[in-house]
Every structure is written in structure tokens, then in C-alpha cells.
A protein has these predicted regions:
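Active-site nucleotide/adenylate-binding loops and adjacent lid/helix of ATP-dependent enzymes
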Residues: 2, 7-12, 92-181, 189, ...
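A short beta-strand motif that forms the metal-chelation/ATP-contact edge
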Residues: 6, 61-65, 194-197, 251-266
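Conserved N-proximal alpha/beta basic substrate-recognition cap immediately N-terminal to
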Residues: 10-121
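Short amphipathic alpha-helical segments and helix-helix/interface helices
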Residues: 27-31, 73-78, 103, 131-134, ...
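Short, well-ordered alpha-helical microsegments
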Residues: 51-52, 72-75, 127, 166-167, ...
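Short glycine-rich anion-binding loops that position phosphate/pyrophosphate groups of nucleotides
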Residues: 69-71, 147-149, 261
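Phosphate-binding site of ATP-dependent enzymes
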Residues: 155-236
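A long amphipathic alpha-helix within ATP-dependent nucleotide-binding catalytic cores
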Residues: 180, 207-255, 259, 267-269, ...
Length: 290
């Protein structure tokens, strides 16, 4: 196997519902910016490399930037890291975005994170608990979310307004072989989408309001929003990341989700430059100068 300077790995098609082109383009454009800096960049699809034994038996690349998320790829990519390759995002950072890891990490480190817990999708063990949740004054609705990776199909994230709806969502997960789900309290307010690059030094940040909502435009501190978002990213060790937050009527900000390397669709051109600059800052000088 020929040793490569930089290698880009696209996201799995399954993990790009309605975003296949957008996910493809942000990685491709990032690579083009790096090529413009005189670096050799090659791209591969995860399906290409997952089935190739020869792929993993050769020398690892010096640097890989990747959007793939499945464990069948993360495990061998971790071996690349152990052999000295630089991965952006790192394998552990990507794993940290699996909700069964993310929920405990962010619940313990953040002041404003919605009450969230992992629950069994076997509703036989949930009947009394579900009834009690909605009997309590002021409780509900709740979000039911897939416990590991982010959206792969409709129903992976949905709002339940009654115990019956929670039960139906859990049963749907169980029918797909998903043993656990996340039960997360709903926070009322303006829903904001977030994008970030970097952890310290030169960083890049953008936000926008989600579509399809009755927007109240509650006032809030953009500095506080940025600080909270980057704090969460550092907790998970993410370098290229996206997320969602809610701004309440009182101006409080709750981070409700964070993920590795989103599509950056509306900011694709400037985001690709920011990501490439970040990657360049992580490349050993001996590679950058070759």
C-alpha cells in the first residue's frame, strides 16, 4: 500500500439521510482547499475500505480526515491512530458522540443540558414509569432518540406527547433490534443549529435558526452560545462538529445535541476553508513541507 499524505473518508450513505450530496461536498471541498496548499489528498468511500482486508494491512496514512461513524470502521481506524496517524476527528471523539456516551459526559459537565436518561426499549419494564412521567405536573413532552449514532432514518429522533406515544416509539426501536433509547426532556424555545471548527487558538463558529418552527426570537448572548458549544466539543474532544441548542423565553441556552462533522450546508464554502486551515494546523511540518 502506498503511503499517503492526507486521506479523506466520506460518511456512510446510511448515515446521511437526505444529506448525501451535502455530506459529500463538504469533505470534497475541504480536500480541494488542502490540494490548493500543495498537499496530496485522496478520497475513499467507507464502503470501499470496509470490505478490503488489504486496506487495513498496509501502512496507515499520515493524516486522515473523516466523516464515517460506524464501529466496523472506527475499530481499524483506531489501529491507525495507535500507529501514529492523525485522525480528525479522532476515533474516541466520534465514539463520544454516540448518545450512550455523550449523555453522561455532557450531563456531568454542563450546567444547562436537558434531563436525559438511557431506557430499555422493552416497554414491559417501563409501564409504571411512563405513566408516572406524564402524571407529574409540568412534565412532558419528551424526545425519544436513538442511543448510538445520530439520524439514519425517520423515527430515530421524535417527540412524544403522551405515555402511549413514548411506548410506540420504544416499540419501534425494539422491532429494529435497538435495545436502548434516550429519553430527554423537551425544552420550549427557539431551536438553533450550530457549527464549529477547532478547540483552541483559531476557531470558527456559525449559527442559524432551524426551519419549520414558530420563531419567537428570544434574546440571548451569542458569546454565551459559542462558549457553551465549544465547551461541550472540548468535553467530547471534537475538532469539527455541529449541534443543536434551544434558547428559552428567559434567554437561557440549553445544548440538546452535538455531532461529529456535519454537512455545514449553508456555510459550506467558508466552512471548508476553516476546516482545511484547522487540518493544516494539525499536520506535522515534515508532511506539510513534503
Amino acid at each position: 500500500m502506498i503511503r499517503r499524505s492526507l486521506l479523506g473518508i466520506f460518511r456512510e450513505t446510511l448515515h446521511s439521510p437526505e444529506r448525501i450530496f451535502d455530506d459529500y461536498e463538504i469533505l470534497r471541498l475541504t480536500g480541494e482547499v488542502l490540494r490548493g496548499e500543495g498537499l496530496e489528498v485522496k478520497f475513499f468511500r467507507p464502503e470501499q475500505i470496509a470490505r478490503s482486508i488489504e486496506w487495513w494491512s498496509g501502512s496507515p496514512p499520515d493524516v486522515a480526515f473523516l466523516m464515517c461513524e460506524q464501529e466496523r470502521l472506527l475499530e481499524p481506524l483506531g489501529e491507525w491512530e495507535r500507529q501514529g496517524a492523525i485522525l480528525i476527528n479522532s476515533v474516541e471523539a466520534i465514539r463520544n458522540t454516540y448518545r450512550y456516551r455523550m449523555i453522561p459526559l455532557l450531563s456531568a459537565s454542563m450546567e444547562r443540558f436537558p434531563a436525559s436518561e438511557l431506557i430499555s426499549t422493552d416497554t414491559r419494564f417501563q409501564e409504571s414509569r411512563l405513566r408516572a412521567l406524564f402524571r407529574r405536573s409540568g412534565r412532558g413532552p419528551f424526545w425519544i432518540k436513538r442511543v448510538d449514532v445520530h439520524n439514519t432514518q425517520p423515527g430515530d429522533v421524535s417527540l412524544a406527547r403522551s405515555a402511549d406515544e413514548v411506548r410506540a416509539r420504544l416499540a419501534a426501536f425494539k422491532s429494529r433490534g435497538v435495545a436502548q433509547a434516550v429519553l430527554q426532556e423537551h425544552i420550549e424555545g427557539d431551536l438553533v443549529k450550530l457549527y464549529g471548527v477547532g478547540q483552541s487558538g483559531e476557531t470558527w463558529f456559525r449559527w442559524l435558526y432551524h426551519k419549520d418552527q414558530v420563531l419567537k426570537r428570544h434574546r440571548f448572548s451569542e458569546e454565551a452560545l459559542r462558549g457553551m458549544f465549544f465547551e461541550a466539543a472540548r468535553t467530547l474532544d471534537l475538532e469539527v462538529f455541529g449541534g443543536d441548542a434551544v434558547v428559552t423565553s428567559g434567554g437561557s441556552i440549553y445544548l440538546i445535541d452535538i455531532n461529529a462533522w456535519p454537512s455545514f450546508a449553508l456555510f459550506r464554502s467558508e466552512a471548508s476553508v476553516a476546516i482545511a486551515r484547522h487540518i493544516l494546523s494539525r499536520i506535522p511540518e515534515t508532511i506539510a513541507a513534503s
